[in-house]
Amino acid sequence: MVDIREWVKTFSAAMEEAFGDRLLFTGLQGSYGRGEATEDSDIDTVVILDHLDAADIKTYEQVIDRLDRRELVCGFLSGRQELLNWEPSDLFQFYYDTIPVMGNIDEILSLIDLEAIERAAKSGACNIYHACVHNMLYEKSLDILKGLYKAATFVIRAVSFTDTGEYTSDLISLAEEVCLQDRNIIYTFSKLREGRPADFEGIDVYKRQALWDACPTGATERIP
């Protein structure tokens, strides 16, 4: 697996060399940032420049093409003003799931009010509900189901934040803070990450239906 501490140091140094004073922020998101990475995990980077144009995107591409494990590099590239104009409900997860490497993005905190967090939770739950029904009827995909359970953990984090005022990244700690229904979703996601059943139908029907049931009775009702 990637030595992520050394990798992000190399990444940030390469970005500073390419963009100089225009580089405002570098960070790490995703499973590596949360300590949940596996051998196949993407490296989700964040880079914020003073502004972003097509030439900058090309420069960024040339830089990451020279890095080790290029095939794993994913993430977010933006200009400062574009980030400030972003939908606040999206900024909630963006801010709290990002580990700063160079600089900070604290100026977006003022945009993330309670209404934005509630909107993030409710829209996330609605999207999961729709996708669960679609998957059960048509796709019958284990990969989609695993992705929906992963998405649900972020909805649970948002709901928990509205209750406690604190963001809990670690899933084990999060499971200890939430209701039984949400805890079961977290545990099921953890189990799905550990081993893959032969096919979609091989999964206990409870695991398929529990996530679907949790959406209307969970965040969509608990968040006004």
Give residue ranges: language-model regions:
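Secondary-structure boundary/capping signal
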Residues: 23, 53, 71-72, 167, ...
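Short gly/ser-rich loop at a beta-strand->alpha-helix junction or flexible surface loop bordering the NTP-binding
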Residues: 23-32
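Conserved nucleotidyltransferase catalytic core and NTase-mimicking acidic/glycine-rich helix/loop elements
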Residues: 9, 110-224
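Metal-dependent nucleotidyltransferase catalytic core
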Residues: 1-18, 34-39, 46-88
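A general structural signal for short secondary-structure boundary/capping elements
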Residues: 73-76, 89-96, 122-123, 194-195, ...
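Alpha-helix C-terminal capping segments
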Residues: 66-67, 98, 134-136
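Hydrophobic, well-structured mid-protein blocks that either form specific transmembrane helices
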Residues: 86-127
